[in-house]
Amino acid sequence: MSVLVKEVIEKLRLDIVYGEPELLEKEINIADITRPGLEMTGYFDYYTPERIQLLGMKEWSYLISMPSNSRYEVLKKMFLPETPAVIVARGLVVPEEMLKAARECKIAILTSRAATSRLSGELSSYLDSRLAERTSVHGVLMDIYGMGVLIQGDSGIGKSETGLELVKRGHRLVADDRVDIFAKDEITLWGEPAEILKHLIEIRGVGIIDVMSLYGASAVKDSSQVQLAVYLENYDTHKTFDRLGNNAEELEVSGVAIPRIRIPVKTGRNISVVIEAAAMNYRAKEMGFDATRLFDERLTSLIARNEVQNA
């Protein structure tokens, strides 16, 4: 996985101060960025030139305070062929020595009016998501009441049909058939569609449907956090399914675990409504409202009262 410099420019709306077309095609392979503070003093041990170099007010002020020849020399040491680009934040004026060094070393110089901390956060978040290792899973990813719900199950059980019904009920399709999932951080999973399948859903007997064309832009979403997994399986009278919601099960992807529930599919059951309820119930639990715990408390209280009455 890699990101091109021109993609970063487009995403963060950066201005190009210097950058030939071929320089904007440079690949970025590391999500980390560097704010070169010590490097400007001449200390280059552990310097990582493969990262994007971000200069804020502190770095810029120190650079401007240096004599012109020293400024040029330190920038020449910083700007190496493997450096993807240099970004100057806060709309600060790029020194002539920086432009000279960039031309000689063939490195794009970019600027942004955004504050350094904000720009750093946006850039890191974007690179983390783009460069994260993807895991492809079979299923349908839906945005239900603002929650990312991954619907899985055996082939032919009705995942896509359920997704289409959820779209008709006002929810949004993120991905059908193949969902590319990546860990945005240690506790968060995100999912997105394969580019070739974006906004498309396959219904047996009908064919491929362009959800955006049929239902509008409000019916689709380019990516979503994956917060809950729902596994559809055929109803089996010999199998016990969770009736109280107290049997915790998890799905682990890329080292991150999310809760998973199993829903038996049976003729006459409205699976889309059940999944809606599951999503709302999960959100209620996250907010501290647990119906299972409430039922358990009521049952315990009832048993205690009966014991007192029968004593």
UniProtKB/Swiss-Prot annotation:
Record keywords: ATP-binding, Carbohydrate metabolism, Kinase, Magnesium, Metal-binding, Multifunctional enzyme, Nucleotide-binding, Serine/threonine-protein kinase, Transferase
Pfam families: Hpr_kinase_C, Hpr_kinase_N
Catalytic residues identified in the record: 138, 159, 177 (proton acceptor), 243
Chain intervals for the UniProt region annotation (Important for the catalytic mechanism of both phosphorylation and dephosphorylation): 201-210
CDD domains given in the database record: HprK_C
GO BP field: regulation of carbohydrate metabolic process
Positions of Mg(2+) binding: 160, 202
Span list, region Important for the catalytic mechanism of dephosphorylation: 264-269
Assembly and interaction partners: Homohexamer.
Name of this protein: HPr kinase/phosphorylase
Organism name: Streptococcus pneumoniae serotype 2 (strain D39 / NCTC 7466)
